[in-house]
Amino acid sequence: LALRTGISSIIIPNVLDFENPPQINEKQTEAFWQSIGLQKNDVKIVQPTRIIQRKGIEHAVQLVEELDDPRYKLIITHEAGDEGFDYANWLKEDAKQRGVDLRVINIHMSDPMNPDVNQKETHSLWDVYPHADFITYPSLYEGFGNAFLEAVYFKKPLLINRYATFVQDIEPKGFDLIAMDGYLTRKTVSKVKAILETPEHRANMVNTNYDIAAQHYSYAVLRRWLNIMLANFFGINR
């Protein structure tokens, strides 16, 4: 904004309540996984997005194919919608040809941030994350990256594509992630496999990421920036 118009601005990032870890309803989350036919020994690779071409979900399909283990299941949390179904149909066919067990959740998810809005929906993303083993987020571009922040909040390892906003605003914070540059390499697949098979390494990774996010994307950060903005606009400090 400053470069194009000369107007200064303050960027308020997406935030989550990192001061308080997520409250997990074990009965609810177990019921969710059972409802889509998964077993306890299945390794759940979760793509927590809608099926849209810019999400680059074909890379997640390729990842599961190259991990080459029948225990690995790819779960996409939202169906296609207003953007059309051509990509979704192609993606499902591609997964079938590659021998990837792909599950697309076709129930409407309630908003975990507004639980009273959609009371008829019995599940939300907060039921998905707790038992996920790995998160894929190979988006081509994003405004910010809600799924990235949610994965960190639930202490899940993830694969992320280095889209422009990530490179500019998130990567400099020093998160410990498995990153790809527009395509999946054997080295990247090996890193994913190592994380999935090494609990100690995985725990160190996700705990480090949680601590970093708490410093930069917590409610405390939001409160601080709002106080600064109020002081700038009105000369007061709340």
Name each model-derived stretch.
Residues 15:
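Carbohydrate-associated surface elements
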Residues 140:
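Aromatic "clamp/platform" in nucleotide-sugar-dependent glycosyltransferases that forms part
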Residues 85-127:
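Nucleotide-activated donor-binding/catalytic signature segment of Leloir-type glycosyltransferases, i.e.
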Residues 135-136:
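A short hydrophobic beta-strand element within the catalytic core of glycosyltransferases
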Residues 34, 39-55, 61-64, 74-75:
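Conserved donor-binding/catalytic core segment of Leloir-type glycosyltransferases
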Residues 22-38, 90:
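A short helix/loop element that forms part of the nucleotide-sugar donor recognition site in Leloir-type
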Residues 197-231:
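A charged, aromatic-enriched C-terminal amphipathic alpha-helix characteristic of glycosyltransferases
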